[in-house]
Amino acid sequence: MKTKILSLANEEVGEISLNEDIFAVEFIRDDIIKQVIDWQRAKAMSGNHKTKTVSEVLGTTKKPFKQKGTGNARQGSLRSVQMRGGGVAHGPRVRSHATKLPKKVRKLGLIHALSEKCAEGKLLVIDSLKLDKPKTSALVNILNKFQGKSFFVIDGNEVDINFSLAAKNIYNTVVVPQIGANVYDIIRHEYVLLSQEAVSVLEERLR
């Protein structure tokens, strides 16, 4: 499958052949894409939620009042779960939310996400992702030429430092090397910009 190579000025400068097994899968598996996104989001959760149990709450262990004769329901501790300021029963604990997902499924998710963007016409190949200076305003003007609301930019094995610094303060714009290409960011951004180097490395990686 052939597609245009664009410059950062959004002008056609050539043509490139894309591997159809990676960028033009015939049937897009939305279920696989969702599986991978759920796996990514679960893994990203901090899992540091926690409440204190009866044994962890600070306070006296003294019986609040005698067993009989007060007319109140019997109580053995002020730290019990039914008491104000007491412990929490069955509350959240610190844990990892990460789940396991086979590498083959992760790889398929990436292939189908790239194919979906390509089918929408929102995967663009750029000849070079390099800037002379790390100027945010200059990069904003460049991205405005593509008329998109959000951009996921994938470079080769290394990202140009000027391009990376210029993009840091731009809303809804993420710049990563090819190893950082992931399904969640591909789907949540409107446009995916790939350098020529990124195309060749991704094709080698996902073959």
Curated annotation (Swiss-Prot):
This is Large ribosomal subunit protein uL4. Pfam families: Ribosomal_L4. One of its GO terms (molecular function) is structural constituent of ribosome. Coiled coil: none annotated. It comes from Rickettsia rickettsii (strain Sheila Smith). Part of the 50S ribosomal subunit. NCBIfam families: rplD_bact. It comes from the Bacteria. GO terms for biological process: translation. Belongs to the universal ribosomal protein uL4 family. HAMAP family: Ribosomal_uL4_B (MF_01328_B). Disulfide bonds: none annotated. Gene3D superfamilies: 3.40.1370.10. Keywords: Ribonucleoprotein, Ribosomal protein, RNA-binding, rRNA-binding. One of its GO terms (cellular component) is ribosome. One of the primary rRNA binding proteins, this protein initially binds near the 5'-end of the 23S rRNA. It is important during the early stages of 50S assembly. It makes multiple contacts with different domains of the 23S rRNA in the assembled 50S subunit and ribosome. Forms part of the polypeptide exit tunnel. InterPro entries: Ribosomal_uL4, Ribosomal_uL4-like, Ribosomal_uL4_dom_sf.
